[in-house]
C-alpha cells in the first residue's frame, strides 16, 4: 500500500508538472493519458482500498463493534491477495506497447492512435477485473460484519461515525462496480469484436465513452 502510494504520488507529480506550465513537458498525449489512467487506479485500488479500508478498517471496525473479528476473516485474505497480481498486470499494461490510456477505444479526438493496441488493453482490463473482485469481497465482508457482528447493546444509531463511513462506502462501492464492470466489458468487446459502442465514426456514443 505504501509502495503504491509513493508510485501514485510520483505519477501525480508528473501530471501536475505537465499541467502546471505552458506548453508540453512529455510531448506525448498518449503517454499523458496512460499516466492519468494508471495514477487513478493505483491510488484507488492499491492505496486507499487495502490500507485505509482493508488494513486499518479490518482492525478498527471489529474493535468499534465489540466483535472478536470480521464476519469472514479468510475472505479478507482472499480479497487482499488478489491485489498484487492485479497491480502487476496494471503496471505491465503500461510497459507493453504504448500503454492503455484514454485512447483505449477508437475515439480519435481523445487518442493519437487510430487503431486499438492489443495486449496492453487486455492487461489493463483484466487487472481491473481482479481489483473489482477484490473490492466486492471486501465490501461484502464489511457490510455483513457491521450488520451481524455488533454486540447486543450496539444499536445502529450508536455506531461510531467511522463504522458508518465504512458501511456506506462499501454499499456505494457495490453499487458502482457493475457500472465499471460493464464499461470494461464493453471496452473489451469493442476492441476484440470490432463493434461500435464508443466509436462515433461507426455510430457509437462519445458521451458514453
Curated annotation (Swiss-Prot):
PROSITE patterns reported for this sequence: COX1
Pathways involved: Energy metabolism; oxidative phosphorylation
Keywords noted in UniProt: Calcium, Copper, Electron transport, Heme, Iron, Membrane, Metal-binding, Mitochondrion, Mitochondrion inner membrane, Respiratory chain, Translocase, Transmembrane, Transmembrane helix, Transport
Main subcellular localisation: mitochondrion
Protein's cellular compartments: Mitochondrion inner membrane
Binding residues annotated for Fe(II)-heme a, in chain numbering: 39
Membrane topology (Mitochondrial intermembrane): 22-33, 101-122, 182-209
EC number: 7.1.1.9
Sites where the protein binds Ca(2+): 18, 23
SUPFAM superfamilies reported for this sequence: Cytochrome c oxidase subunit I-like (SSF81442)
Gene Ontology annotations of biological process type: electron transport coupled proton transport; mitochondrial electron transport, cytochrome c to oxygen
UniProt GO molecular function: cytochrome-c oxidase activity; heme binding; metal ion binding
Stored Gene3D superfamilies: Cytochrome c oxidase-like, subunit I domain
Cofactor(s) in the UniProt record: heme; Cu cation
Entry's cofactor comment: Binds 2 heme A groups non-covalently per subunit. Binds a copper B center.
Catalytically driven reaction(s): 4 Fe(II)-[cytochrome c] + O2 + 8 H(+)(in) = 4 Fe(III)-[cytochrome c] + 2 H2O + 4 H(+)(out)
Entry's family note: Belongs to the heme-copper respiratory oxidase family.
Its job: Component of the cytochrome c oxidase, the last enzyme in the mitochondrial electron transport chain which drives oxidative phosphorylation. The respiratory chain contains 3 multisubunit complexes succinate dehydrogenase (complex II, CII), ubiquinol-cytochrome c oxidoreductase (cytochrome b-c1 complex, complex III, CIII) and cytochrome c oxidase (complex IV, CIV), that cooperate to transfer electrons derived from NADH and succinate to molecular oxygen, creating an electrochemical gradient over the inner membrane that drives transmembrane transport and the ATP synthase.
UniProt name for this protein: Cytochrome c oxidase subunit 1
Organism of derivation: Octopus vulgaris
Name of the gene this protein is made from: COI
Amino acid at each position: 500500500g505504501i509502495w503504491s502510494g509513493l508510485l501514485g504520488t510520483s505519477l501525480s507529480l508528473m501530471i501536475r508538472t505537465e499541467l502546471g506550465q505552458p506548453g508540453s513537458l512529455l510531448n506525448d498525449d498518449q503517454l499523458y493519458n496512460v499516466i492519468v489512467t494508471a495514477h487513478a487506479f493505483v491510488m484507488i485500488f492499491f492505496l486507499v482500498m487495502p490500507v485505509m479500508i482493508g488494513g486499518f478498517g479490518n482492525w478498527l471496525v471489529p474493535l468499534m463493534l465489540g466483535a472478536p473479528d470480521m464476519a469472514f476473516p479468510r475472505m479478507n485474505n482472499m480479497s487482499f491477495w488478489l491485489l498484487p497480481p492485479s497491480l502487476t498486470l496494471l503496471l505491465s499494461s503500461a510497459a507493453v506497447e504504448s500503454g492503455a490510456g484514454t485512447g483505449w477505444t477508437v475515439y480519435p479526438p481523445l487518442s493519437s492512435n487510430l487503431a486499438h493496441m492489443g495486449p496492453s488493453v487486455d492487461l489493463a482490463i483484466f487487472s481491473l477485473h481482479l481489483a473489482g473482485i477484490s473490492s466486492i469481497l471486501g465490501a461484502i465482508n464489511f457490510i455483513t460484519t457491521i450488520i451481524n457482528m455488533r454486540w447486543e447493546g450496539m444499536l445502529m444509531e450508536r455506531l461510531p461515525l467511522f463504522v458508518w463511513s465504512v458501511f456506506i462506502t462499501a454499499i456505494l462501492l457495490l453499487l458502482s462496480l457493475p457500472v465499471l464492470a460493464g464499461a470494461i466489458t464493453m471496452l473489451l468487446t469493442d476492441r476484440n469484436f470490432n463493434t461500435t459502442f464508443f466509436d462515433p465514426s461507426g455510430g457509437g456514443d462519445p458521451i458514453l465513452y
